[in-house]
From Swiss-Prot:
Organism: Campylobacter curvus (strain 525.92)
Role summary: Catalyzes the transfer of the diacylglyceryl group from phosphatidylglycerol to the sulfhydryl group of the N-terminal cysteine of a prolipoprotein, the first step in the formation of mature lipoproteins.
Keyword field: Cell inner membrane, Cell membrane, Membrane, Transferase, Transmembrane, Transmembrane helix
Keyword Membrane: yes
S-S bridge residues: none
Coiled-coil region(s): none
Residues engaged in binding a 1,2-diacyl-sn-glycero-3-phospho-(1'-sn-glycerol): R152
Similarity comment: family membership: Belongs to the Lgt family.
A molecular function (GO) term: phosphatidylglycerol-prolipoprotein diacylglyceryl transferase activity
Main localization of the protein described in the UniProt heading: membrane
Localization annotation: Cell inner membrane
Entry protein name: Phosphatidylglycerol--prolipoprotein diacylglyceryl transferase
EC number per UniProt: 2.5.1.145
Length: 270
């Protein structure tokens, strides 16, 4: 077995310890994801002459981060945890980073829940600061997949969201079973590939909202494919017709993107 196959046995998901708290590589990658997304946003604002100031953009990212964290955590609890009743009757436990007195961080986030939180935060922000909603969402469509790359690499380094069992030569040994490095597949397809397509397509954009609608379609297609290599969520398994919860939610998001595209295109005024 090569060093790559056995990488988890030679790699510590904890990067370092600071004042008694373990700092995981996932946390570092999460911060890199945020900073890279914000950096990309500022680049496209200047490059494409998008009418929003740096100060307002920084403020917007603060709003979005709150929405994403709330949506991702609540979405995970409601859909994946299997303990929704407990958490919603003990709300102080939702963001409790301690378990039996030990700091373990906040575990369990849902991408699709994050999308809901992101959209609500963006809508509220645009109403308060009188911004063009669809123009701002198009900007986010370029930044999200760029930051997403680091997020999925973080999942890989954190040794979570394992792939399905396989015999391919690049599989990763997880507790004695060779598995697909599905987190890296997702970083490549749902992150890098989607970003590159939108990056080059943005110059051909015909109406505000086109990029975010296209992002929804591209992301869900990539996620649907990657889910075939990813182990279904524990406690949920396959939902129907051999499809995972991630695939079911992606189907809904796909049609949401299609409907948004044709609605915006129909109402576009040249």
């Amino acid at each position: 077995m090569s060093t790559w196959n056995d990488i988890y046995n030679h790699f510590d998901p904890v990067a370092f310890t600071l004042f008694g708290f373990s700092v995981h590589w996932y946390g570092i990658m999460y911060i890199l994801a945020l900073l890279s997304a914000l950096g990309a946003a500022k680049y496209f604002v200047k490059k494409d002459n998008i009418p929003i100031t740096d100060a307002l953009l920084d403020n917007y990212f603060f709003w979005v981060e709150i929405g994403v964290i709330l949506g991702a955590r609540l979405g995970y609890i409601a859909i994946y945890s299997g303990e929704a009743v407990y958490f919603f009757t003990h709300p102080w436990q939702i963001f409790n980073p301690f378990h039996n007195g030990e700091f373990v961080g906040i575990r369990g986030m849902s991408y699709h829940g994050a999308v809901v939180g992101f959209l609500l935060a963006t809508i509220l922000f645009c109403k308060k600061y009188k911004q063009n909603l669809w123009q701002l969402l198009d900007l986010c469509a370029l930044c999200i997949p760029f930051g997403y790359i680091f997020g999925r690499i973080g999942n890989f380094l954190n040794q979570e969201l394992f792939g399905r069992a396989t015999d391919v030569s690049w599989g990763i040994n997880v507790f004695g079973i060779l598995r697909h490095p599905s987190q890296l597949y997702e970083a490549a397809l749902e992150g890098l590939a989607v970003f590159l397509i939108l990056f080059f397509y943005r110059k051909f954009k015909k109406f505000d909202g086109e990029l975010i609608a296209l992002y929804a379609v591209l992301y869900t297609l990539a996620r649907f494919v990657c889910e075939f290599f990813r182990e279904p969520d524990a406690g949920i398994g396959f939902i129907i017709f051999g499809l995972s919860m991630g695939q079911i939610l992606s189907i809904l998001m796909f049609f949401g993107g299609i409907l948004a595209y044709f609605f915006l295109k129909k109402n576009y005024i040249k």
